Design a protein with these regions (language model features):
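Extracytoplasmic beta-strand/coil segments of soluble accessory domains associated
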Residues: 1-33
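Transmembrane beta-barrel outer-membrane domains
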Residues: 8, 47, 52, 91, ...
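N-terminal periplasmic accessory domains that precede
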Residues: 13-16, 28, 44-47, 59, ...
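Structural signature of outer-membrane beta-barrel domains
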Residues: 22, 34, 82, 103-105, ...
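Short acidic/polar hinge/loop motifs at secondary-structure boundaries
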Residues: 34-63
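Extracellular loop and loop/strand-boundary signature of outer-membrane beta-barrel proteins
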Residues: 41, 99-100, 155-160
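Outer-membrane beta-barrel pore domains and translocons
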Residues: 62, 80, 99-105, 118, ...
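Periplasmic-side early beta-strands and strand-to-turn transitions of outer-membrane beta-barrels
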Residues: 93, 110, 114-187
Length: 187
């Protein structure tokens, strides 16, 4: 209740909790506090993890427990990425998944790839995504057609300039477990 998102870039959105957003909300990914990736806050901290690599999201509206970092007036978003896969007993795991999509408005194409190779003690996981999108089109002409500000391309009257983007996220997870202990390295 009271949680929404403001889409301010093609790469991610900014969480809004009870009308507060941006630096008024604490965002933790795998235990690390993150802030916007650029000075004008176009890419929120959520742009540093792909949605296909999320295992759990917890949202705290308003006051946040000290165990989750406290220090936020709007609330907190706590994200945990996928944990490594391990095989049962002496089996081996070989899992691979590819998904893709395409949108016609801005000719956006995206691919997600995940791969896991594991025994019952060691695990290697890769999760990657890449998206490439052109400028999107408005419902009708809203301006005169002209050259872009850089003079390198022509922008139609229904085209929203500077809305094109490319984005990629990659995560490699190495895991080792023995008895009740897990060592996890994420790059």
């Amino acid at each position: 209740t009271g949680v929404n998102s403001a889409i301010n870039s093609g790469a991610s959105s900014m969480p809004v909790i009870r009308g507060l957003s941006d630096d008024r909300i604490k965002i933790k990914i795998d235990g690390m506090d993150l802030i916007s990736a650029c000075a004008n806050h176009m890419n929120s901290p959520l742009s540093s993890i792909d949605s296909s690599n999320i295992q759990q999201i917890k949202v705290f509206a308003g006051l946040t427990p000290v165990s989750m970092g406290g220090d936020s007036i709007g609330g907190s978003v706590v994200i945990n990425s996928m944990q490594p896969d391990f095989a049962k007993s002496d089996e081996k795991i070989f899992k691979h998944k590819i998904s893709t999509f395409y949108t016609t408005n801005n000719k956006a194409s995206r691919v997600n790839i995940s791969s896991s190779i594991a025994s019952n003690k060691l695990s290697f996981n890769y999760n990657g995504s890449y998206i490439d999108a052109k400028n999107f089109k408005a419902g009708k002409h809203f301006k005169d057609s002209r050259l872009s500000a850089t003079g390198r391309q022509f922008i139609d009257g229904d085209e929203v300039g500077s809305s094109a983007f490319k984005d990629g996220n990659h995560m490699i997870t190495l895991g080792s477990r023995k008895d009740n202990q897990l060592i996890n390295i994420k790059l």
